[in-house]
């Protein structure tokens, strides 16, 4: 819950898996959904289910808890599916399995990918060359290579299925089934002001984690910042 990107994506994921919505069509937060997710996070903090050091440590340090056996559940980068099978990185190999993301009742109907992506900058002077790079980088062969060298999980479901079936990705659990319910929480695509919006989100969440704001105040702070961004 440090003031960096992971708390923002955590809030998005919670709201989206709980209620199927984060932003309304006009780009503003869906207050009911986002506030419910914030209150859930606040409950975890108040009931001391968040390790004190995770309020100020990096997201990667928090993620690595799953590989050290000090966490029982992780929502984070899919690369940890492969990391959890690497004895050099994980002390509990064989004890971790991907499951379908839970919803408020039973399984969630949808989940989301992280908002990072690769594309061609509108200011690029070599758009065709850049497009070819994107096509190469996201090709099936390159996705296999990136899994081998970087533990990156393929975004192509066909490649993911192939690596699971040939045993490259082991202990895959519900990963393939999960991949089929991934969708974007952004009704109009990722906004141009995403970085500023995310900053407002994670700073408000961090203040809540440190006891400086309650859930309602955290929501008001981030919603106010988003309103300013929309009106610029």
Regions found by a protein language model. Name each.
Residues 72-77:
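Paired acidic/hydrophobic, glycine-rich loop segments that form the ligand-binding mouth/hinge
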Residues 53-67:
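Short helix-initiation/N-cap motifs at beta->coil->alpha
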Residues 1-30, 71:
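Extracytoplasmic/periplasmic solute-binding protein
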Residues 26-55, 97, 101:
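Glycine-centered hinge/linker elements that transmit conformational signals in sensory
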Residues 47, 87-152, 203:
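Extracytoplasmic/periplasmic substrate-recognition and gating elements
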Residues 18-19, 44-49, 70, 84-88, ...:
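Sec/Tat-exported extracytoplasmic proteins
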Residues 98-100, 148-200, 207:
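Long, aromatic- and glycine/proline-rich binding clefts that accommodate carbohydrate-like moieties
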Residues 215-226:
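Short, well-structured alpha-helical segments that form the helix of a local strand-helix-strand
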């Amino acid at each position: 819950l440090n003031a960096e990107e992971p708390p923002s994506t955590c809030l998005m994921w919670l709201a989206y898996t709980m209620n199927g919505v984060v932003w309304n069509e006009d780009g503003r937060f869906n207050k009911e959904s986002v506030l419910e997710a914030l209150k859930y996070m606040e409950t975890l903090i108040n009931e001391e289910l968040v390790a004190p050091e995770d309020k100020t440590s990096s997201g990667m340090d928090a993620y690595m808890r799953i590989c050290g056996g000090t966490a029982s559940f992780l929502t984070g980068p899919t690369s940890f599916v492969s990391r959890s099978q690497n004895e050099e990185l994980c002390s509990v190999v064989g004890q971790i399995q991907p499951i379908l993301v839970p919803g408020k009742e039973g399984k969630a109907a949808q989940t989301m990918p992280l908002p990072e992506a690769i594309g061609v900058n509108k200011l690029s002077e070599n758009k065709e060359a850049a497009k070819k790079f994107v096509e190469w980088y996201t090709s099936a062969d390159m996705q296999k290579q990136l899994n081998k060298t970087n533990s990156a999980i393929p975004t192509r479901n066909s490649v993911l299925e192939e690596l699971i079936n040939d045993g490259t990705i082991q202990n895959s659990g519900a990963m393939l089934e999960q991949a089929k319910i991934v969708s974007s929480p952004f009704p109009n695509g990722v906004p141009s002001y995403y970085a500023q919006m995310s900053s407002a989100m994670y700073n408000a969440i961090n203040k809540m984690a440190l006891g400086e704001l309650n859930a309602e105040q955290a929501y008001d702070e981030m919603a106010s910042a988003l309103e300013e961004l929309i009106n610029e």
